């Protein structure tokens, strides 16, 4: 019974020792003065982005800070601010600038492309005949494929 009493007596003595042994509390970053914070922030920023490299690394960001914000502009306002295009880029949309119906424009462009078909100058009748021949070949090919498929599956055992 003496031992438990000694342990109990030692515990209160050890408790004050832990209080005395505590290391001094360091100041949290929130409690530091603003001057210390700003100097630390500047040094960390300088490590990552030295001032001489900033314009090279982030030119868009720097330019965007100088520009006044353009907020509240609707799509109509943005399009009205642009000058109208006189000629579309790369010839895209030329047909919109030309006058006449689709058939008229097609008839005008036909002579330009007449010789482009495999280097041959074909009349309309010849082109129609060639198209009919191709369609007939496709039909015959499809019929043969269907016949082959049916013949394969009509047997009681696989080939």
UniProtKB/Swiss-Prot annotation:
Disease entry from the Swiss-Prot or TrEMBL record: Hijazi-Reis syndrome: A neurodevelopmental disorder characterized by hypotonia, abnormal gait, developmental delay, intellectual disability especially affecting expressive language, and autistic behavior. Additional features include facial dysmorphism,ocular anomalies, and gastrointestinal issues. Rare patients have seizures. Disease severity is variable. Males tend to be more severely affected than females.
Tissue specificity note: Expressed in all tissues examined. Highly expressed in heart, ovary, prostate and skeletal muscle. Moderately expressed in brain, placenta, testis and small intestine. Weakly expressed in lung, liver and spleen. Expressed in several cancer cell lines.
Protein name (record): Transcription elongation factor A protein-like 1
Superkingdom, natural source: Eukaryota
Biased composition (Basic and acidic residues): 17-34, 64-80
Keywords: Disease variant, Intellectual disability, Nucleus, Phosphoprotein, Transcription, Transcription regulation
Similarity comment: Belongs to the TFS-II family. TFA subfamily.
Any Gene Ontology CC annotation: nucleus
Subcellular location, record wording: Nucleus
InterPro entries on file: TF_A-like/BEX (IPR021156)
Post-translational modification: Phosphorylation of Ser-38 and Ser-39 is critical for transcriptional repression.
Gene name for this UniProt entry: TCEAL1
Biased composition (Acidic residues): 37-54
Residue span of region Disordered: 1-97
Described purpose of this protein according to its UniProt entry: May be involved in transcriptional regulation. Modulates various viral and cellular promoters in a promoter context-dependent manner. For example, transcription from the FOS promoter is increased, while Rous sarcoma virus (RSV) long terminal repeat (LTR) promoter activity is repressed. Does not bind DNA directly.
List of residues that carry Phosphoserine: 28, 33, 38-39, 43-44
Major place of residence: nucleus
